Amino acid sequence: MDSKEIILNVEKLNTTFVSDKKKIRIVKDVSFQLKRGKTLAVVGESGCGKSVTMNSIMRFTGKNAIVEAKSIQYNAMKDGKIEEHHLESIKEPNGAEMRALRGADLSMVFQDPMSSLNPVYKVGDQVAEGLLQHNKGMTKQEAREKVLEMFRKLGIPDPEERIDCYPHQFSGGMKQRVVIAMAIACN
């Protein structure tokens, strides 16, 4: 298969959590591919490791986790060319290389939108923060316009008013749309 078709290729992902007395493997030999233009649904029983799998790829597992994989390859498309990133070889989960990918290339929409939204900041500012972080030449006004565009695309009513609201002023579904805007704004 042409590597241009595959965005994410995960091979034999294992995640083990270490406590004082034992090691518990939560994710065992997970493999999958995500193809460009396609949707991948990860389903399973509660507690089966879906969230741990995705958190492992994004490197959100914490210090007591051991994440190992044969390969976690992310293929970014930059200026019509494939740019390969081997996430399994990134040693610092919060280092510059992983931070540069998060938000700009890789994003995750959590089940509970309030876990991603800060209650003391306006939702528009929270979406704009990622844009400004990953687009150094962008002005605050340009970021605001991009946020308004995202809100319109995602069906948030009255975006010109809602951009200056706080998370508690949104329904659960609208909060989810704000988090989706955060995830895709840099694409």
Question: Each predicted region: which residue ranges?
Answer:
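ABC transporter nucleotide-binding domains
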Residues: 1-187
